Amino acid sequence: MQIYEVTDARFRKYGKVIRNIDFSALTEAMKKTPVPSDVVYEPSIAELEALPVAKEIEKVFYGELPIQIGYCNGHNVLLNAVEYHRSSEINLAATDAVLILGSEADVTDDFTYETSKMEAFRIPAGAAVEVYATTLHYAPCHVDDAGFQVAVILPKGTNYPLDEAHAGGEDALLTAKNKWLIGHAEGGLPEGSHIEIGRAHV
């Protein structure tokens, strides 16, 4: 799979580089977070949310909606699933990382997806990008053996456990609050996750 830069014109349909917020303090704080041998996602970290930039993100980017700042860290070279939200997500790279992205418009009527349509983009350390709500994504991939550290910023409550059962049509894809998931049969995901047609590898 060819890897493009987030500054490439191809990235524009998936998101954009954020240039009007100073993320330097958050980048430094992220460097202190753990990098496991697999992948770990934490939706909300109090120490990150206590940084002054959190209020700026709420005001400037999310229109005064409350947010959560967590991280996705570790080592990964596979795409085992794709997910999307009803809101944009900010990814801030504390290390170089690769995002594998696709378009929700390419999900079929039976809620499957062909991963050969996805494209990979390198996000350099210190850069932050908006990932549009209509962009399919999942855990980043590392670019070297040191692994990756990526801050994940979303509206508060996203990716937390559901309060009710969901089934039928797109509703069946809802696996957590504000999280619709299409999974791969070999991806180690919960039974019942919808199955994608292909599988990507970087």
Describe the function of each predicted region.
Residues 131:
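Aromatic-residue-lined binding/catalytic grooves and analogous aromatic/hydrophobic interfacial grooves
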Residues 1-125, 136-199:
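Active-site region of the double-stranded beta-helix
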